[in-house]
Design a protein with these regions (language model features):
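Domain-level detector for secreted/extracellular nuclease and nuclease-toxin modules, and
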Residues: 4, 11-296
């Protein structure tokens, strides 16, 4: 059930005027020290819209970091460092969906499983389960602190293809930093169950530390959505967030050539080998499970 946004929650909507400069140091949000390795040059994304800072809480997980908003009851971003090795490890982890509430957050400031029940929206990951290099990391990715209400067609189609394309890019280049987040823009922002804000758009920003290139995918959170590439400077104005604050303005002014979103490709030897390995692992696990059930 999608309900109109109550006026108080409009505080989270991005204002282009408010996004013109970073928060002063006195308003800077604390960083989780253990998560600094997940940020480009060890610096967390910076909120440039002060309205987004209200009831914002940073959380550190094994393979990603989030900044969670008690106003929207969603994450404002999830940050990751993807490498060739981590992507290869992630392909060997069997997916086990187990969405759960995030107990580290105040109950009134977080989403619950009940909020998403019969909402008409998918529980969309910011840091994808498919990026997680271990079973523990994958389980953590199903925390609702890493989830936003996402259009089903987008989540299962275009967005899934973007996630896979980013993993392939990490495999090709060796290391990239990724920041993913929602955008709440305009006066038509809605909320499921009157509690959890529904993004109007989604972004996935990428930075290659070897070449200095950066850019972002921008996708409307609606059926029939098409993606476009934007610079980090454009994203900052739209989202109220400087995703890679350590980068020079010259790198933020131009969008890198982003790979065309596509699902898992068997076109290259490396990706085909990974596919065959994962297929073999999945088949063996199913056979083992069936054998155990037959015996016991």
């Amino acid at each position: 059930v999608l309900r109109p946004l109550v006026p108080a929650l409009l505080l989270v909507a991005v204002s282009h005027a408010a996004a013109s400069q970073a928060l002063p140091e006195s308003q800077a949000l604390p960083e989780a020290p253990a998560c600094r390795a997940l940020f480009a040059d060890g610096r967390a994304p910076t909120l440039t819209n002060p309205k987004l800072a209200d009831r914002a809480v940073p959380l550190c997980f094994e393979a990603f970091a989030v900044l969670h908003s008690g106003v929207s009851r969603t994450p404002l971003y999830a940050a990751e460092r993807l490498t060739r090795r981590s992507v290869s490890a992630a392909r060997r982890v069997e997916r086990a969906d187990a969405f759960h509430d995030e107990d580290r957050l105040p109950e009134d400031d977080r989403a619950s499983l009940a909020d998403y029940l019969r909402s008409g929206y998918d529980r969309g990951h910011l840091a994808p389960a498919g990026d997680m290099p271990s079973a523990v990391a994958q389980a953590e990715s199903f925390s609702l602190a890493n989830i936003v209400p996402q259009n089903r067609a987008v989540n299962r189609g275009l967005w899934a293809a973007i996630e896979e394309s980013v993993r392939r890019l990490a495999s090709e280049r060796g290391e990239i930093f990724v920041v993913t987040g929602p955008i709440f823009e305009g006066r038509s922002v809605g909320a499921i169950k009157g509690r959890v804000l529904v993004p109007t758009q989604m972004f996935k920003a990428i930075y290659d530390p070897r070449t200095g290139e950066a850019g972002a995918y921008l996708v409307p959170n609606a059926a029939g959505a098409e993606w476009r590439a934007v610079s980090l400077a454009t994203l900052r104005e739209t989202a109220g967030l400087d995703v890679f604050p350590a980068l020079p303005e010259a790198s933020k002014a131009k969008a890198m050539a982003l790979p065309e979103p596509q699902e898992f490709s068997r076109g290259g030897p490396e990706s085909f080998a990974d596919f065959l390995k994962q297929l073999a692992v999945d088949v063996l696990r199913r056979l083992w499970s069936e054998l155990m059930r037959a015996i016991f």
